[in-house]
Amino acid sequence: MKKQKLICAAAASAMLLASVTAFTGCGSKDNSSAEGASSAAESSSQAAAPPEKTAAVHKQNGNEFDTYQSNTYVATGNNGIVKNAESVTYRAYFPAEQYGELDYRFYFSNAVDSTYNTGAPVHVGMEVSGYTIESARIADGGTSPDDEITNYTDVTFDSEAGREVAAGDDFWSDAVKFDLPQDHYLVWEWTLTGKKIPATNMANLTSATSSVEGGDFEYCDPLPLPQLIGADRGAKYTVAAIGDSITQGCQTDFMAYEYWAAQISQKLGSDYAFWNCGLGWARSSDAAADGNWLERTKNADIVIVAFGTNDIISGEYGGDGGNSAAEIEDYIKQVIAPLKAAGSSVIVFNAPPEDYGDEQESVRTEYNAVLEQLCNDEGVYFFDFASLLCDPETPAAAKY
């Protein structure tokens, strides 16, 4: 099963790589892989673009996102809550997309991005509180969490060591120069005090620990994090992926980074900065709320929209169960519209198989049957993600 899952992720990332590089005109780190995937895409219609859609362009948003681009493929959105923290230090390890000496800045949003599970613990738009940043720093984590952490470097906020964060606040750290050796982890560490602090359900994607008042670091999930690990990389294009746990990479091996979003990030090369905005349990209705989650995603040149699974299973928060195909279509349109208005090129995935019961599978089948035409009507790209994750003879059965 694990081997089959990796094959599926590799196939999806190769096909998507061909789509992204085709309409930007830039090569990838592995051009032979992209060329082979491109030929396959042409023959199988895996990626379809409306004829009137032009090539992606590198946007100028007039804000910090123009300069500071994602430098990790680990997602750090807010789909969790820390109920109470009293001088708790949180630590996480991040693989980098680009190494060497770079200027870093970190972006934060004190808001919940998406609904988790039933929405009882956390839901989109829920009220949060203010909190205090007592200190923050980055460091060289070596090549393993077992290595000694070195080169601790303070991160400041308006030249201060800490910051008072109000409910709903979004803000940037000051710039900090840091030299990260090849294949070393970037460590993020900060000390917080507060209640109802938005956090990331990390789901085994990286080493996530916390320490209370100087005690030993122990496993911690969820944990609060910056929403962007940003660096002045000078990439020609920025790519963001907004979606659910399949995009976030949940239920994959610890710190293996074999899910499709990590694979495509590693293959795209230095012309691209990839920002993983996937969140476990997220629905298209969460993104359609047009909160900070979608707002920050609008800054990317290319946005991948990958929903369907939790829409079918759970539906929007406060609803009465899974959504119908028509309801999902409407939410997807509400996600597409502001992205297009912001000047982003959009790629929409269809819903992958999930070994559903008959009723839920009928919703997936109906939704997938109309999605390509919806994308053509909306002037965005369609990507047949589902066909890469199923056997053609049994399309309803997941092979991952």
PLM ranges: what are they?
Residues 5-16:
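Sec-dependent N-terminal signal peptides
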Residues 187, 304-306, 347:
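Structural motif
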Residues 236-241, 246-333, 355-357, 365:
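Conserved SGNH/GDSL esterase-like catalytic core that processes O-acyl groups on lipids
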Residues 327-341, 366-373:
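Alpha-helical scaffolding segments of alpha/beta enzyme cores, especially the outer helices
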Residues 21-25:
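C-terminal motif of bacterial Sec signal peptides marking the signal peptidase cleavage site
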Residues 28-242, 247-248, 252-253:
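N-terminal secretory targeting modules
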Residues 342-346:
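A short helix->loop->beta-strand "cap" motif at the edges of active sites that frequently abuts
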